[in-house]
Amino acid sequence: MPRDIITLGCTECKQRNYTTTKNKKNTPQKLEFNKYCRFCQKHTLHKETK
């Protein structure tokens, strides 16, 4: 399967809040999104984790 499931973790509280998919051939770098963290109760940077 070309698309791999990845999780996005909050950089402030380290909670893993979101899952998404990505094609590792097209985007070899780690993904970063500004998303809402329900534990911090604000928008924070979420980075790709294992």
UniProtKB/Swiss-Prot annotation:
One of its GO terms (cellular component) is ribonucleoprotein complex. Disulfide bonds: none annotated. It comes from the Bacteria. The keyword Endoplasmic reticulum does not apply. GO terms for molecular function: structural constituent of ribosome. One of its GO terms (biological process) is translation. Keywords: Ribonucleoprotein, Ribosomal protein. PROSITE patterns: RIBOSOMAL_L33 (PS00582). InterPro entries: Ribosomal_bL33, Ribosomal_bL33_CS, Ribosomal_bL33_sf, Ribosomal_zn-bd. Belongs to the bacterial ribosomal protein bL33 family. PANTHER family: 50S RIBOSOMAL PROTEIN L33, CHLOROPLASTIC (PTHR43168), LARGE RIBOSOMAL SUBUNIT PROTEIN BL33C (PTHR43168:SF2). This is Large ribosomal subunit protein bL33. It comes from Citrifermentans bemidjiense (strain ATCC BAA-1014 / DSM 16622 / JCM 12645 / Bem).
